[in-house]
Amino acid sequence: IKIITREKTLGKNFFFANEPGQVSFEEIDYNQTAINKALSNYDVVFNLIGILAENKKSKFKFVHTEIPRMIAKGAKINKVKSFIHLSALNINVIKDSKYALSKYNGEVELKKEFPNSVIVRPSVVFGKGDNFTIFFSNLSKFSPFLPLIGTPSIKFSKNIFKTFNFNKKVRFQPVYVGDLSKFLIKMISKKNKTYEISGPSVKSFSQIFDLILEQKKRTRIYLPLPFFIARVMAFFLELLPGPLLTRDQITLLKYDSISKKGLSNLKKVISNPLSIETVLKTYL
């Protein structure tokens, strides 16, 4: 097993239940020549590369579109038997997000090079070290407020009155990283398929915050944050290195990340997928 990365030192943070020498890390620059060489003599390739926000070194188009295309081409050249690509839920229907567009274009490009590839589109992924539950848990350490982004929903019109809907909430169907990993392994035998994947429970921001705060034994105030206010805040946060929130992420949050079909797909492989309620207490 070989793990390809741009930063080999990150391998020090991983621990594997394997014999010495069975897992190795290889540091490469992401260009076609290097990728072709790295994939030589391997039967199965997983592409798990992705970013949530752009910076000077990493742009959505390169990471989500160009790299998958190069990996798919390298897999074809090396006659790889199976190529599994990790994408994201609903990117095929979201048209106003740079993240979603780059992800979807990546799917299109890799299919041109490796038509038998398997694409997996999960909802929000949670587990030890994630960028979702851990972020809000850490935020609750020092902030008395937790943001309910997208609540209330506000409809603007020509009239002086506007519609405020506090019942409109962004919904997620989080999938446990352990279940997702098992699902990906089972995809090795599949050809030319696309699967949505989602967990067993649908949660709003406030319900996820409830679980986090209950586990950490904290009390915080939930602050309603309509999208237009969140976008203004994100604009200023983007001026900082490593922004906590971006306008493109706000755009993504306009769309629910849920899928009944996704849960059905997961249950075909994992009979009893773990819920966020069950797993959260094991790592927070």
Give residue spans per PLM region.
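Mid/C-terminal beta-alpha module of Rossmann-like enzyme folds, strongest
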Residues: L180-T246, S259-L284
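Conserved Rossmann-fold NAD(P)-dependent oxidoreductase catalytic core, especially the SDR/UDP-sugar
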Residues: L52, F62-E113, S117-S123
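A short helix-to-beta-strand connector/capping loop
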Residues: N18-F25, F114-P115, R218-R220
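Conserved beta-loop-beta element that borders a ligand/cofactor-binding pocket
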Residues: V108-K141, F145-K155
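NAD(P)H-binding glycine-rich loop region in Rossmannoid oxidoreductase-like domains
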Residues: E19-M70, G74-I77, L89-I94
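Substrate-positioning beta->alpha
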Residues: N131-F132, S153-I188, K193-E196
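N-terminal Rossmann-fold cofactor-binding loop
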Residues: I4-T9, I28-Y30
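Short-chain dehydrogenase/reductase
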Residues: K61-T65, D96-E107, K111, F126, ...
